[in-house]
Amino acid sequence: MDAAAMESLILELHAIEAVKFGAFVLKSGITSPIYLDLRMLVAHPRLLSTVASLLGSLPATRPYDLLCGVPYTALPIASVLSAAASVPMLLRRYHVTPHAAAECLDGSFRAGDAVLIVEDLVTTGSSVLETVAPLREVGLVVADAVVVIDREQGGRENLAANGVALHSLMTLTEVLAVLVKRGKLGEEKAQEVKRFLDANRKMAVPGLPVKPKVVRKAFSERAGLATNPMGRKLFELMEAKQSNLCVAADVGTATELLDLADKIGPEICMLKTHVDILSDFTPDFGHKLRSIAERHSFLIFEDRKFADIGNTVTMQYEGGIFRILDWADIVNAHIVSGPGIVEGLKLKGLPKGRGLLLLSEMSSAGNLAHGDYTAAAVKIAEQHSDIVIGFISVNPASWSVTPSSPAFIHATPGVQLVAGGDSLGQQYNTPYSVINDRGSDIIIVGRGIIRANNPAETAREYRIQGWHAYQSSLS
């Protein structure tokens, strides 16, 4: 918007009393000498249309698929923009119960869709972030917000800290300058407002602490740091397929598992199995699964959770009816029995180029894998980096002791599009939260995909969301 158009718009907003001066208590709790009331736009359809059109012309950092207006004043603006630009719109209900993000949204969307937030005013940015949260909870990507007026009181900075770029038609400073220039505002009152702005330039969002963003090296770069060939292969495969999705194939029969693997194979980097729950297991199961894995380029992770002494686990790994060593690229282990378990698995796995994940944390409520246990897992991993490729973890960003090398990968179970839990104590987090807030690399999804009506399509949605979260964590 050029200077002349902005000046004309400011004068029109002043004429309809959308800009007022006095003493007003804002949502943030502070008293302001100026009040901006853009609700008045609904009484002036031509001006409403102009504002919507101008907002639509603001450049976003990425193309968007949907619009979402912040309740309530911005809703008519977003509606007009949606109709004019033929961009579908989502409605966010204002009151929503915890872990019910999907229920607070009306409209049609898919995980991975990009949403442009539409707002009338931004002070601290809290209202925008309250709308961003449920959108991200259901797998939508939010990178931009457009606003009519930026009050310049910390909103831009608070939003940027949460991964949202703010684009405004005008700032409050520009509004004051035009009104003084055109004789609509006295210099004394303008100075009072400016002093207020100077004293309140960077306000924190009330009750919404800014989480530090986890920034990581690219998978392609970390591949070169891996000492284990399977760890290197996993990084390279994720980069090539643009997938950091692992599906937990917790089904009851080998027939179901092989069918599922073939359907979702193109979307995943890894398939997690529990071979000992397959009621129809036969010795050729491993060969059949490896054929599917090779066809679709994914790794097989047998979630055996070895926990015994070294001598016993070598026999469990290599022998028995399952012969896990023959077909599983990766296995995992508890460290309760000490480093001997890793040495035993390494004895058999390393000559075959296999990889090992250590259980450093778990996603079930009340588990004991945390604190000193997690620190011990890190120490053992670094002592055996030739076989250990990473960890099963829940919140590696919170660890007091962290691996010295980014070659170790983190895979996190308990991921769904909406946060919450189940009746057996499993705790679920969203892909965005797991990758950006908790610092993991791979999302492990089970019931969210295997119980879906269309597992392949649902896996694609999770893959897109997980990959977008990874990409946003690179800078």
Swiss-Prot record:
The keyword Glycosyltransferase applies. It comes from the Eukaryota. SMART domains: OMPdecase (SM00934). PROSITE patterns: OMPDECASE, PUR_PYR_PR_TRANSFER. Pathway: Pyrimidine metabolism; UMP biosynthesis via de novo pathway; UMP from orotate: step 1/2; Pyrimidine metabolism; UMP biosynthesis via de novo pathway; UMP from orotate: step 2/2. GO terms for molecular function: orotate phosphoribosyltransferase activity; orotidine-5'-phosphate decarboxylase activity. InterPro entries: Aldolase_TIM, OMPdecase, OMPdecase_AS, OMPdeCOase_dom, OPRT, PRibTrfase_dom, PRTase-like, RibuloseP-bd_barrel. The keyword 4Fe-4S does not apply. Keywords: Decarboxylase, Glycosyltransferase, Lyase, Multifunctional enzyme, Pyrimidine biosynthesis, Transferase. CDD domains: OMP_decarboxylase_like, PRTases_typeI. GO terms for biological process: 'de novo' pyrimidine nucleobase biosynthetic process; 'de novo' UMP biosynthetic process; pyrimidine nucleobase biosynthetic process; UMP biosynthetic process. It holds the Pfam family OMPdecase. Its EC number is 2.4.2.10, 4.1.1.23. In the N-terminal section; belongs to the purine/pyrimidine phosphoribosyltransferase family. HAMAP family: PyrE (MF_01208). This is Uridine 5'-monophosphate synthase. It comes from Oryza sativa subsp. japonica (Rice). The gene is UMPS2.
